[in-house]
Amino acid sequence: MLCSHDDDDPIRTAASHGIRRVRAFDAQRFELAVQSLLEASGIEIDTAHTGKTAQRVRELWQRRLLDGYDIDPAEALGHGFEDPRRDMVIIRSIAVHGVCPHHLLPFRGVAHVAYLPDGRLHGFGRIARMIDAISHRYTYQEWVTNEVAHALVAHGQARGAACLIEAEQLCLLMGENRRGDERVITQCYVGEFEQNMQARTEFLRAIKG
C-alpha cells in the first residue's frame, strides 16, 4: 500500500470507516445539545431567528454530514457487472465532504479515483455513493483517501485502485494568520498502482485535465 498518510493505529483496518459509532444517532439528544450550545454561547433559543435552529442543525448533520454511518460502502458500490475490459477507469472531481472530529468542522473538496478492472465494471454513480458512505462520518481526509482506494479493491474486485482528494479544511482555513486559500492533498495507491509508476503517472496526468 502506497499512501500519503499511513495510520498505525491498530484498530484501523481497511474494513473500518471513520470514527467508530458505538450507538445509534439520537435525534432528540442532538437537538437538546444544539440548544445547550446556543445557551452556553449566550443566545436565546426561542426567538424568530433561533426557534428552529436545533431542528435544522440536526437534520443537516443526520441527513448530510453523518448519513454515511447508515450506509454500507460495499452495498453502495454493489456487485457491478461482468466485463472483460482491463483498461484503467478514471473518475474526476467527485464531490466529497466529512467532519473532522478534532473541531467538529467539515472538510470539503473533490475526489479523483481510478481502478484497474479485473472482470467487473461499476456504475459511476455507485462509486460516488460509496465515497459518500465512507466520507459522511466523523473522519479525516487521510482516512477517507485510504479507505476509498482499499474499498475499490476489496469490494470492487479491482486489480488496483488510486484515490487523490483535494479539500478545504475549515479548521485550517479559519485558523489565525491564514490566507484562506489553503488546500490539503492526500493520495493512496493500492494493488497494481503500488508498484506501477506508469499507471500512477497516467492517473495523475488524466486528473489534471
Swiss-Prot record:
One of its GO terms (cellular component) is cytoplasm. It comes from the Bacteria. Its EC number is 3.5.4.16. It is an enzyme of class 3 (hydrolase). It catalyses: GTP + H2O = 7,8-dihydroneopterin 3'-triphosphate + formate + H(+). One of its GO terms (biological process) is tetrahydrobiopterin biosynthetic process. Pathway: Cofactor biosynthesis; 7,8-dihydroneopterin triphosphate biosynthesis; 7,8-dihydroneopterin triphosphate from GTP: step 1/1. GO terms for molecular function: GTP binding; GTP cyclohydrolase I activity; zinc ion binding. Gene3D superfamilies: 3.30.1130.10. InterPro entries: GTP-CH-I_C/QueF (IPR043133), GTP_CycHdrlase_I (IPR001474), GTP_CycHdrlase_I_CS (IPR018234), GTP_CycHdrlase_I_dom (IPR020602). Keywords: GTP-binding, Hydrolase, Metal-binding, Nucleotide-binding, One-carbon metabolism, Zinc. Zn(2+) binds at residues 100, 103, 171. Belongs to the GTP cyclohydrolase I family. Toroid-shaped homodecamer, composed of two pentamers of five dimers. This is GTP cyclohydrolase 1. It comes from Ralstonia nicotianae (strain ATCC BAA-1114 / GMI1000).
